[in-house]
From Swiss-Prot:
It is a peripheral membrane protein. The gene is apcB. It is found in: Plastid, Chloroplast thylakoid membrane. GO terms for cellular component: chloroplast thylakoid membrane; phycobilisome. This is Allophycocyanin beta chain. Keywords: Antenna complex, Bile pigment, Chloroplast, Chromophore, Electron transport, Membrane, Methylation, Photosynthesis, Phycobilisome, Plastid, Thylakoid, Transport. One of its GO terms (biological process) is photosynthesis.
Length: 161
């Protein structure tokens, strides 16, 4: 996992260069939003269970997926879906705090699509639930922090598409 600082420094180091204006501006932007990201992470942590509950209700609860024969039918499958959504919320929050999505590649996306396909997990429904989680989280955090967090939910959805 990298953070925005490590990413900028590693890029310059590989090129054998000092940080240029563009690199320094990236760091300034990262530091300028630090308090916003920390407050957002605290709000998400305090409300994670409700975020998941509202997201499931909004996207999945009353769809065919939860009815007999659907992929979330049976308590075990439903619980696995809830567990996965909680995992995505937590890792997206880590990425937002770091200012870098690499943790999502390393711990979520690498091999996930293939795993879901092999298990018969409907990717479309997963993306729909993540989009609902983005909406719920954005409503809770407000515009600025919601937009920041949305980048990481969108990154997960893009990786699953």
């Amino acid at each position: 996992m990298q953070d925005a600082i490590t990413s900028v420094i590693n890029t310059a180091d590989v090129q054998g260069k000092y940080l240029d204006d563009s690199s320094l501006n990236k760091l300034k932007g990262y530091f300028a939003t630090g308090e916003l990201r920390v407050r957002a992470a605290a709000t998400i942590a305090a409300n994670a269970a409700n975020i998941i509950k509202e997201s499931v209700a909004k996207a999945l609860l009353y769809s065919d997926i939860t009815r007999p024969g659907g992929n979330m039918y049976t308590t075990r499958r439903f619980a696995a879906c809830i567990r996965d959504l909680d995992y995505y919320l937590r890792l997206a929050t880590y990425g937002m705090l770091a200012g870098d999505p690499s943790i999502l590649d390393e711990r979520v996306l690498d091999g996930l699509k293939e795993t879901y396909n092999s298990l018969g997990v409907p990717i479309g429904a997963t993306i729909q639930a993540i989009q609902a989680m983005k909406e719920v989280t954005s409503g809770l955090l407000g515009v600025d922090a919601g937009q920041e967090m949305a980048l990481y939910f969108d990154y997960i959805c893009s990786g699953l598409s």
